[in-house]
Amino acid sequence: LNREDYVETLLDYYENPRNRGSLDPAHLHASGGNPGCGDLVTLYARLDDTGHIEALSFEGEGCTISQASASILTELAQGKTLAEVEAMSYDDLIDVLGREVVSVRPRCATLGLSILKSAAQDYTKAERAQQS
């Protein structure tokens, strides 16, 4: 894809967000922000019986990159386990979004993934504590 294609994709996900809205019930629910840009993202995830993400949604406000990235992330992480989410690479996400386009705003681009990784770690720790 060229720069224009990446910009078009980001604008499409910003203007027509996929999986936007709260999710009830949700096993994971976490929020975070990027004070420098005023971005806010809240992610909701529901897991199936095998520990895979069966539903993932987001709510938020902020710049095009943070909101489009959160929307794209809801599709990328669908079907993954929490361990797979924790292993997701920020670099890979930036490549999917278009490195040339989002490289000036990496914190905006990776905000959703940071929140999801943190929520996955917290959930996994709580599950382990409950089992011991």
Feature locations, PLM:
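C-terminal binding/interaction regions
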Residues: L1-D24, H29-A30, E54-A55, K80-S132
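Short beta-strand elements
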Residues: N34, D39-D49
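Short, thiol/selenol-centered motifs that function as redox-active sites or metal-ligating centers
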Residues: C37, G60-A68
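Short, glycine/acidic-enriched capping/hinge loops at junctions between secondary-structure elements
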Residues: T42-Y44, L56, S69
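A cross-family signal for key residues in well-ordered alpha-helices
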Residues: Y44, T74, K117
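Immediate flanking context of iron-sulfur cluster ligation sites
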Residues: G51-G60
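Catalytic-loop motifs flanking and including active-site residues across diverse enzymes
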Residues: I65-A70, C108-L111
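Alpha-helical support elements that line or immediately flank enzyme active sites
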Residues: S69-K80
